């Protein structure tokens, strides 16, 4: 009979310390003289996953019961035992709220099946990096908002490529001013109503300047330029959705 502590240590070793099961098996034999096959350790991990599944589902339901979600997906390499010796590019999908719970879901691909199943008929505000798959999931009233950090990144790339590009520098400065509004609200610990009032006061003029600057830049930019892509229209709702963050990097 194995103790719970050994099983927990195995799971923590695999997922928190990134120590694969074959290595843990070898370490147990080397350090303790205990022979446990990788398959045995794998069975433990799978059983723990089964026991935690109801908890993960409860967290999912809690997230979907709210009005605001952030979503992101991170590529992970998965070792395949198909004889080719190459890794498969899978994805770890993350759903959560700032300073709230985060649920991770592993999927072998980046298609819409994963978020469609996870989100169900969610009709709140979903914020992402702008990945188009999120436009075709959720309930009929769901609003797909985007992330100013990802928009800003494009203009940072333009500044790095062309340091003297006044249009790109101006856009980065304006977007930074949007982040400063949220930083001011967080520093003052404003509630949602006060945050909305602050955004309503300061954001509209900035958004107009950003939109005008982007329109002007796109009129002269080459198609392959970092300034050429058209921003998603949901990004202009920043002033109205005061409960949404500027970005999707608020998992803690």
Predicted feature locations:
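Catalytic center-proximal scaffold of phosphoryl-transfer enzymes
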Residues: 1-252
């Amino acid at each position: 009979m194995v103790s719970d502590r050994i099983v927990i240590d195995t799971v923590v070793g695999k997922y928190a310390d990134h120590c694969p099961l074959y290595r843990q098996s070898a370490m147990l034999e080397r350090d303790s003289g205990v022979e446990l096959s990788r398959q045995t350790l794998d069975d433990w991990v799978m059983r723990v996953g089964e026991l935690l599944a109801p908890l993960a589902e409860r967290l999912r339901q809690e997230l979907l019961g709210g009005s605001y979600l952030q979503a992101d997906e991170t590529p992970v390499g998965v070792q395949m035992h198909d004889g080719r010796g190459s890794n498969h590019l899978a994805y770890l999908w993350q759903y959560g709220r700032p300073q709230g719970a985060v649920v991770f879901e592993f999927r072998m691909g980046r298609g819409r099946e994963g978020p469609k199943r996870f989100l169900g008929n969610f009709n709140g505000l979903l914020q992402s990096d702008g990945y188009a798959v999120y436009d075709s999931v959720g309930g009929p009233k769901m609003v797909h908002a985007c992330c100013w950090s990802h928009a800003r990144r494009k203009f940072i790339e333009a500044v790095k490529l062309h340091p003297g590009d006044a249009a790109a520098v101006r856009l980065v400065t304006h977007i930074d001013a949007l982040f400063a509004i949220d930083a001011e609200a967080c520093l003052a610990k404003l509630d949602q109503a006060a945050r909305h009032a602050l955004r309503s006061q300061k954001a509209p003029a900035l958004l107009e300047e950003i939109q005008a600057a982007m329109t002007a830049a796109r009129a002269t930019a080459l198609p392959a330029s970092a300034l050429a892509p058209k921003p998603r229209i949901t990004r202009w709702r920043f002033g109205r959705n005061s409960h949404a963050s500027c970005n999707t990097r608020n998992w803690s």
